[in-house]
Amino acid sequence: MTQIQIRMPTSTKPKVIDLFCGAGGFTLASWQAGFECVAGFDASEVLTSRFSENFPKTTFVKCDLQSAQVSDILRGTGLKAREIDGIIGGPPCQGFSWIGRREANDPRNTLIHHFFRLVRSIVPRFFVMENVPGLLHQPFSSRLKRELDQLPQQYSLLGPLPLDSADFGAATRRQRILIIGIDSRYVDSVAKEDIAKHYVRTIPTVREAIHDLPEPISSTSQNSDGWAGYSAEPFHGERGSYVKKARRIPPMHLGSVLSREFLSKGLVSGFQKTQHAPEIVRRFKSVAEGGTEPISRFPRLQWDEQCPTLRAGTGPENGSYQSVRPIHPSRDRVITIREAARLQGFPDWFLFHSTKWHSFRMIGNSVNPQMAREVLSAIRSRL
């Protein structure tokens, strides 16, 4: 565990910690739902590289949660265990995933155990864990049941609950499961119907999510984050609401000074250009909306549908595989970092890694912030 500078909690909001925080999708959702996320914990330097810029009021603690003790967690928060209202987190899930082979002995599978180990030790008023649907299948489902059976009896459990981020207003289809635990001594339980109240009436489309974004640019040492100006104004009325929300300048407890300043000038990051060889461009050109390029297996997005699940790829410790990136609906190129972030539900002030590879890992590994925000809002209304 590295030496840290603790940002002491300053508000009266319920306080949560984010385990396996990564880029901070759950952290973002917790702030937006009315919580104070006092600390995020993760072992990855790359996936958390912009965490402190995006969340200036949240302490980031680089640590291996497989070996972390409760004392390490409390030291990182500046709180006593009884002062932590909630624990949220999405332990890495590649070992459970249907994409590629599911590996029963993948060491990442034990991270769920450590999430629940810390929940059992800290005993927060509630917890929320997000993961992939593959966790519901053997042998992983038996392991999950053992973890849940060991929780203190006062927890009222909801889940594993299958959810799709599109139902909560994201422009991408992303199926995940959530497990919610509520300490019935302090908080009224949350039912599936309470979560369903947060479903949107109309699911946003790719067009509604990215219609105002510019073409990619060649990044330079002076502009490694790919800042560029918007290419259009948001649609009028309800069809423009997705973009208008994404463009909002954040409150002072969120976002960096740089992103706030640039956003106020109409500039947004994430437009680093991917250089495609002429042969690749020719292959992309032959793919209709909704089709798949037969060699790369890259799908072309459809303007008036949702984006399929955005994948993360892997880090160097697991082969450095780059994820399949969708082709833009009408341009013969893959989507940019910002287009992916928009589809996944991240606001425009949110910064990612300066490289496309790691940025797509950050986005693909993240809890969908819109889904998480609505689930946490349902819990917040009970506190």
Task: List where the protein language model places each region.
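Class I S-adenosyl-L-methionine
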Residues: T2-T10, D72-A81, W98-E289, N368-L376
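Short alpha-helical patches at coil-to-helix transitions and adjacent helical residues
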Residues: A23, S141, R176, N365-P369, ...
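Core alpha/beta nucleotide-donor-binding catalytic domains of modification enzymes
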Residues: I4-V123, P133-H137, S141-R143, P152
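Short glycine-rich anion-binding loops that position phosphate/pyrophosphate groups of nucleotides
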Residues: P91-Q94, S184-R185, G315
